[in-house]
C-alpha cells in the first residue's frame, strides 16, 4: 500500500509538471501569435492612411502649396510627411523634388540638416553614392557629426571599403554617448567581423 501511494504521488508530480509545461508553452504561443496579429492592422492602417493622403488631391494640393510658397516650419514638416508618402510608394524623384524645395525654404538649421539627411538617404537608396555623400556633407553643426559619420560609414560599407566603414562607425560611437546608438553601431561592426 505504501509503495502504491508513493507511485501515485510520483505520477501526480510528473503529471503536474507536464501540465504546467504545456500550459506555459500554450501561453507563449498565444502571446506571440496575438502580438503578430495585432501588429498587422496597425501597419495596414498606416499604409491606408498614406494612400488616402496620396489620392486625396485636395489635401495634396494644399500640402504642395504650403511647401512651395511658405518658408515656415509647418511647410518643412509637411514636406517630410509628403516625401515619406512618396518614398513608401517608391516615387523617389517626387520625394527628392519636394525635399529639395523644402531644404531651400528651411528656416531652422535642424530642419535643414534633417531634410539634407533624408535627401542623402534617398540618393543612397537610388544607388547615387556621389550625390548621397555630397548631400550628407551639407549637414552643419557638431551635434550631427555622429549621424553623418554613421551614414558615410554605411556608404563605404556598400562600396566594399569595410575598414573605412568600421573606422567611421567607431568615430560615430565616440561622438554619440547614447547607449542605444552605441549598441546599434556595435552590431554593425560585429556583423562585419
From Swiss-Prot:
Recorded topology in the membrane: Single-pass type II membrane protein
Segments in the Extracellular topological domain: 35-193
Membrane-traversing stretches: 12-34
Keywords assigned: Cell membrane, Chaperone, Membrane, Transmembrane, Transmembrane helix
Cytoplasmic side: 1-11
Pfam hit, one: TPR_21
Record's subcellular location: Cell membrane
Keyword Chaperone attached: yes
Keyword Transmembrane tagged: yes
InterPro entries reported for this sequence: SecYEG/CpoB_TPR, TPR-like_helical_dom_sf, YfgM
GO cellular component: plasma membrane
GO molecular function: protein-containing complex binding
Domain of life according to the entry: Bacteria
Signal sequence annotation: none
Function: May mediate protein transfer from the Sec translocon to the chaperone network via its extracellular C-terminal region.
PANTHER family hit by this protein: ANCILLARY SECYEG TRANSLOCON SUBUNIT, UPF0070 PROTEIN YFGM
Subunit structure: Interacts with the Sec translocon. Forms a complex with PpiD.
Similarity-based family: Belongs to the YfgM family.
Entry protein name: Ancillary SecYEG translocon subunit
Source organism: Buchnera aphidicola subsp. Baizongia pistaciae (strain Bp)
